[in-house]
Amino acid sequence: MDYTLDLSVTTVTDYYYPDIFSSPCDAELIQTNGKLLLAVFYCLLFVFSLLGNSLVILVLVVCKKLRSITDVYLLNLALSDLLFVFSFPFQTYYLLDQWVFGTVMCKVVSGFYYIGFYSSMFFITLMSVDRYLAVVHAVYALKVRTIRMGTTLCLAVWLTAIMATIPLLVFYQVASEDGVLQCYSFYNQQTLKWKIFTNFKMNILGLLIPFTIFMFCYIKILHQLKRCQNHNKTKAIRLVLIVVIASLLFWVPFNVVLFLTSLHSMHILDGCSISQQLTYATHVTEIISFTHCCVNPVIYAFVGEKFKKHLSEIFQKSCSQIFNYLGRQMPRESCEKSSSCQQHSSRSSSVDYIL
């Protein structure tokens, strides 16, 4: 599997092929102990992401009941992270053994990765544009920032992410290399240019276009806030801005390495040492990018005031139900605290626009 050249969902590969006509350049980087540690890391990411994003969905659906367009975007962003992380169990098994799930699942699991990648960046872009409209064009935003509009845009994002992913999956297959079944994307002499195009497409759709929109939106927002000095609007964009910055920090390094890999495929960068360095850089930056799927819930917990209150409310209700099931009465102090949290949350709803 040509892992460095192809953004695959798997990391078991031991060799990097700088050219389809040359012999492989030995770039074995992950030894047995390293694979075990990496597998444990993926398992931890899976657990924390599954738990964190499930709590986000629970808060948005049960507590906030999707009352705003931003709630819709945050819900879909959490679903995108969950879709991304669903590839981890397959990836972990593949890392430790071989691909035993067949060609169809090879394409499906790889699709989870790509769709999760594209949709995550697209939803963050939508949230940035939404903040821009809410702050800079507040009157116009009242007309267009509706639940129906948000749902329609989210459906468009999912469709775009799927359409961007489907051409990539055509080349994925399962083949045996040295007696080990591997899931990888195969490119021959005729399709090698398509592979390079795919890498550049990911750079453009996954980083360049979103980053350009981010810069435009937040420059305009900061200019507007500087003029108006509106504290409520400043609070309203803080969470989204932190999510955007975090996503860029996790994904920019990988996109840079992907771009350099494309240059290597075109022989602009050449040499065995370059290929080994790119292989190593891909592994490292991919691990960094994978971590993004469990970061957003942590940001909400530390930055989102209402998110913490809603979690406290859910915890109190759950404890109350457990006490009732056991035939006991919940301590009065906890009930009063839960009631106080609910009242305070309702009073602050007019101030905080998002989690």
Swiss-Prot record:
Keywords linked to the UniProt accession: Cell membrane, Disulfide bond, G-protein coupled receptor, Membrane, Receptor, Transducer, Transmembrane, Transmembrane helix
Any one Gene Ontology BP term: positive regulation of cytosolic calcium ion concentration
Location of this chain's protein in the cell: Cell membrane
InterPro entries xref list: CCR1-9-like (IPR050119), Chemokine_CCR8 (IPR004068), Chemokine_rcpt (IPR000355), GPCR_Rhodpsn (IPR000276), GPCR_Rhodpsn_7TM (IPR017452)
Cytoplasmic topological domain: 64-73, 130-146, 223-238, 305-355
Membrane topology: Multi-pass membrane protein
Stretches that traverse the bilayer: 36-63, 74-93, 108-129, 147-171, 203-222, 239-263, 281-304
SUPFAM superfamilies with a match to the protein in the record: Family A G protein-coupled receptor-like
Annotated disulfide bonds: C106-C183
CC terms in the record's Gene Ontology section: external side of plasma membrane; plasma membrane
GO molecular function, one term: C-C chemokine binding
Pfam families: 7tm_1 (PF00001)
Extracellular side: 1-35, 94-107, 172-202, 264-280
Functional description taken from the UniProt entry: May regulate monocyte chemotaxis and thymic cell line apoptosis. Alternative coreceptor with CD4 for HIV-1 infection.
Family: Belongs to the G-protein coupled receptor 1 family.
Xref: PANTHER family: C-C CHEMOKINE RECEPTOR TYPE 8, CELL ADHESION MOLECULE
Descriptive protein name: C-C chemokine receptor type 8
